[in-house]
């Protein structure tokens, strides 16, 4: 079950391509809206990164923790998860139009999109496209969001499409302030992500 939830977390993490920011944000909190807009614009230019960290899963019938490696190069991604004590591993690679999921001792699965793969393999429908934004400390641009800014005009929390994301700490890397520890609360699923190493890149188009 833990591996299944890890796969879910991985699939939520994927969106290939970028979209522009609209006026779908409801802002509150202590931050300055102008500073937030500048911060958001800077982070939106990031189209590549490498993350090493830990992920924790809490669900009604299962919980556990594992390690996370996430390589993003524009619209290509390579995400690897390893369960506790080496109990299972999963790797998801792809770009728009083709996704491959490899699960240790189980097999290799393909689909045209991460959303399709999630539904085919797990029977679940979840907002697959959002975490690539959330992990940078940004709301996904394609739906309404409620944002709370901290005193530094960065996200303290956001509510979007039935999920709540709390930003507990940030780290500065190469001039970017990026989330270091965040918690995601969804229906019957809580995810904690701790980033041990952020390597952001602006690759260009």
Curated annotation (Swiss-Prot):
A lipid is attached at residue 18 (N-palmitoyl cysteine). One of its GO terms (biological process) is protein transport. A lipid is attached at residue 18 (S-diacylglycerol cysteine). The keyword Lipoprotein applies. It is a lipid-anchor. SUPFAM superfamilies: Prokaryotic lipoproteins and lipoprotein localization factors. Gene3D superfamilies: Lipoprotein localisation LolA/LolB/LppX. InterPro entries: LolA/LolB/LppX, OM_lipoprot_LolB. Residues 1-17 form the signal peptide. It comes from the Bacteria. It is found in: Cell outer membrane. It holds the Pfam family LolB. Keywords: Cell outer membrane, Chaperone, Lipoprotein, Membrane, Palmitate, Protein transport, Signal, Transport. One of its GO terms (cellular component) is cell outer membrane. Plays a critical role in the incorporation of lipoproteins in the outer membrane after they are released by the LolA protein. Belongs to the LolB family. NCBIfam families: lolB (TIGR00548). Monomer. This is Outer-membrane lipoprotein LolB.
């Amino acid at each position: 079950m833990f591996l299944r939830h890890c796969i879910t977390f991985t699939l939520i993490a994927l969106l290939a391509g970028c979209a522009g920011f609209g006026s779908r944000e409801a802002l509150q909190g202590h931050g300055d809206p102008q500073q937030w807009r500048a911060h958001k614009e800077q982070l939106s230019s990031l189209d590549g990164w490498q993350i090493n960290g830990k992920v924790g899963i809490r669900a009604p019938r299962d919980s556990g923790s594992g390690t996370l490696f996430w390589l993003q190069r524009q619209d290509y991604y390579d995400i690897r998860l390893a369960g506790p004590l080496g109990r299972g591993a999963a790797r998801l690679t792809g770009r728009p139009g083709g996704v491959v999921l490899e699960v240790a001792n189980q097999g290799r699965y393909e689909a045209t999109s991460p959303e399709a793969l999630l539904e085919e393999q797990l029977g679940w429908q979840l907002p697959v496209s959002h975490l690539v934004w959330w992990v940078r400390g940004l709301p996904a641009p394609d739906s309404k969001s409620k944002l709370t800014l901290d005193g530094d005009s960065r996200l303290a929390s956001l509510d979007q499409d039935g999920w709540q994301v709390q930003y507990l700490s940030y780290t500065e890397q190469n001039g970017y302030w990026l989330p270091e520890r965040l918690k995601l609360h969804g229906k019957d699923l809580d995810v904690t992500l701790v980033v041990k190493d952020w390597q952001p890149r602006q690759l260009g188009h």
